[in-house]
Curated annotation (Swiss-Prot):
Pathway the protein takes part in: Pyrimidine metabolism; UMP biosynthesis via salvage pathway; UMP from uracil: step 1/1
Gene Ontology molecular function, alphabetical: GTP binding; magnesium ion binding; uracil phosphoribosyltransferase activity
Enzyme Commission number(s) from the entry: 2.4.2.9
Activity regulation (UniProt): Allosterically activated by GTP.
Cofactor(s) annotated in UniProt: Mg(2+)
Gene source species: Shewanella woodyi (strain ATCC 51908 / MS32)
Stated family: Belongs to the UPRTase family.
Task performed by this protein: Catalyzes the conversion of uracil and 5-phospho-alpha-D-ribose 1-diphosphate (PRPP) to UMP and diphosphate.
Keyword annotations from UniProtKB, A to Z: Allosteric enzyme, Glycosyltransferase, GTP-binding, Magnesium, Nucleotide-binding, Transferase
Protein name in UniProt: Uracil phosphoribosyltransferase
Cofactor mode of binding and number, as noted: Binds 1 Mg(2+) ion per subunit. The magnesium is bound as Mg-PRPP.
Catalytic reaction list: UMP + diphosphate = 5-phospho-alpha-D-ribose 1-diphosphate + uracil
Chain's gene name: upp
Residues that coordinate or bind uracil: I193, G198, D199, A200
Protein's UniProt keywords contain Metal-binding: no
């Protein structure tokens, strides 16, 4: 599995701001979208382009446009919605496919409750967004679903990842790509990433 921990100074700075314990919902939400945008920039760096001729201001001009598979953004509800706008900033024409998944606080296992995917998944590149890759369960289950629907090009974008989650994801889906702003130290006994960001969903939405 290709794992990219984005080291750009802007990414490191913004993730640092998100770790503040008393950060406001507004600020956390803004930063989640901003870092999601920067991760999208990295994740799409290998997209192929083709030369096309358009009518410019002074006559025909040759430009480059992205070719190949179209994109679908797959936010994992609910926290993944906080990164979605950052992706759409760069790819506004992307289809939005939604997967509802929550983590059982006792077993730490993912529990699916909703899905609405693009009808042409086999012909699309899926950018799966979720702020936290902790145990990896929700991401693994979501990618399982995407593959069942025929999607073969999948990239996962997360703000913060635990080494345990990275290892679990690589074992389950070695053929995907993972982009993250930070690989943190470890998980605690409750399955939270340390130092982490806290509960990203609660902070993005302002509700528990």
């Amino acid at each position: 599995m290709k794992v990219v921990e984005v080291k750009h100074p802007l990414v490191r700075h913004k993730i640092g701001l998100m770790r503040e314990g008393d950060i406001s919902t507004k600020r956390f939400r803004e930063l989640a979208a901003e870092v999601g945008s920067l991760l999208t920039y990295e994740a799409t760096a290998d997209f192929e382009t083709e030369a096309v001729t358009i009518e410019g201001w002074n006559g025909p001009v040759e430009v480059e446009q992205i070719k190949g598979k179209k994109v679908t953004v797959v936010p994992i509800l609910r926290a993944g919605l906080g990164m979605m706008d950052g992706v759409l900033e760069h790819i506004p024409s992307a289809r939005i496919s939604v997967v509802g998944m929550y983590r059982d606080e006792e077993t730490l296992e993912p529990v699916p409750y909703f899905e609405k995917l693009a009808s042409d998944m086999p012909s699309r590149i899926a950018l799966v967004v979720d702020p936290m890759l902790a145990t990896g369960g929700s991401m693994i289950s979501t990618i399982d679903l995407l593959k069942e629907r025929g999607c073969t090009s999948i990239k996962a974008l997360v703000l913060v990842a635990a080494p345990e989650g990275v290892a679990a994801l690589e074992k389950a889906h070695p053929d995907i790509e993972l982009y993250t702003a930070s690989i943190d130290d470890c998980l605690n006994d409750q399955g939270y990433i340390l130092p982490g960001l806290g509960d990203a969903g609660d902070k993005i939405f302002g509700t528990k």
